């Protein structure tokens, strides 16, 4: 039984994301993970702002992305994306994720995505806001990985 905190997002898979074998192309999984993390931000009361000053935590870069492909996703439909926080540092945040069938029974891919908040003036690492840290603490994993 999975009792770790996580954010669950149902991500639509469209026919134009499929390869010639009707499988979700490997390059599309990161986009679905990004959509899930964006939905988590929105559910937290934050949104992407035209002015960085209105939401400084949105000014971050992806430092690392690791994906392990487990099973093919065949055809269009819905894919479940579970997102949790593996670690949060002063300037970095490591998300864990699991992409699976809509019912969560078939795992397709799992991995980690690391982001680093940067200062918009210097492009150097910059600390997360208290709001970001508090909201992400809700998803902090404290037990072994899901899959």
Regions found by a protein language model. Give the residues of each.
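Hydrophobic beta-strand-centered segment that forms part of the acyl-chain substrate-binding groove
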Residues: 40-93, 108
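Residue-level preference for alpha-helix termini and adjacent loops
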Residues: 14-23, 59-61, 72, 117, ...
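Catalytic strand-loop segment that frames the active site of acyl-thioester-processing enzymes
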Residues: 1-43
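Hydrophobic pocket/interface hotspot
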Residues: 22, 83, 123
């Amino acid at each position: 039984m999975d009792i770790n905190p996580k954010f669950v997002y149902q991500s639509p898979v469209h026919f134009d994301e499929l390869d010639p074998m009707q499988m979700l192309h490997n390059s599309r999984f990161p986009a679905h993970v990004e959509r899930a993390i964006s939905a988590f931000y929105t559910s937290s009361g934050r949104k992407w702002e035209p002015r960085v000053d209105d939401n400084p935590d949105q000014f971050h870069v992806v430092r690392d992305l690791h994906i392990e492909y487990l099973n093919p996703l065949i055809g269009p439909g819905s894919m479940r994306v579970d997102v949790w926080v593996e670690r949060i540092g002063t300037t970095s945040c490591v998300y864990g994720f699991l992409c699976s069938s809509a019912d969560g029974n078939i795992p397709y891919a799992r991995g980690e995505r690391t982001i680093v908040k940067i200062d918009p003036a210097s492009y150097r690492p910059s600390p997360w806001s208290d709001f970001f840290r508090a909201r992400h603490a809700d998803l902090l994993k404290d037990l072994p990985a899901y899959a």
